[in-house]
Amino acid sequence: IYVEAYGNILIFVCHFTNDRRVINAVISNAKVLFAEDDEFDYTKYTKLINETIAGIDSTFKQLDIGSDGDVSDYKARELKIKDSIGESDGSVDEDSTMDMTEESTDQRMSEISNGIRTIDILGQIIRNYTGKLNAQAKSEIISEMHSVSMRMLNSWNVAFDLFQSEFVEFCIEQAEKEFPGKATEQIAKRAKEFLCVMLTTANYSQIHNVSLALSKETLIPACEETLRKNSGISGKLILLDLKMNCLGRQPVDEAIDLFIALSKVNNIYAAQIVRLIVWQFARRTHISHVVRDKIRQAFNFIPSAFLQSDTNEPETA
């Protein structure tokens, strides 16, 4: 699967087969990916997350969910970005592809590509054959999609932890050249926060990859049964993103309840992922001003310029 051409062929084939041999082969491939890594645990922070969590919370509070009138513009910008890299028409710009041939020396990148494709392939099977797969097969596929994504995510977290010292040193060196006399402690703090923002964004993208692969309304019961029972916080995040950003549902109260529950047990990092899920939903979905304001207040998002001007506007006869 890590060879791009073969991966694309297998994705295509999985549009047309639910053969148990194919499913078993893909699941077996998934189980060896990141086999040395544990699944990412949202209750156990890495050193980088521990050192920057307060700054991350402050950063994501600054996100603006905009107004209902901004939704179309936001979607248009998304399409332009997808067009620019060739995603929308099925091609991919040469600069945005990675060499995943057998000669590639970067085995870790090959494994990441393999993991992403494996999730996509399992998603193709379960979406196309929802009615023909029995409950056990669906549960097995969903569980392995979740497991490989969390092992991959844990691998990223470990890598970011190892990389942070080198990155901070680089930032300090560059800042000293550009801004002599600047406090190194402040530079180091900002550099770590920037790195953690990148990690948190990557974290959400991995959650979204799984929810996108499971994006079929009739899969909701199987997803609920499998992810809520065995997958802890990460399963709840996938379910929330699946409903809000893939299936067009509006479980705003469910999102607020999860955010409050995580905040009460001081799981600030997982709460930030909920905040990102809701931010993405609010930016891409037409909702009433009442619901948008409810989201803004519950998640402490900054007021939009639209609402500020609207409240200051004098009444007309």
Residues covered by each model-derived region:
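Hydrophobic repeat-domain scaffold segments
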Residues: 1-181, 210
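Charge-dense, extended regions
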Residues: 162-317
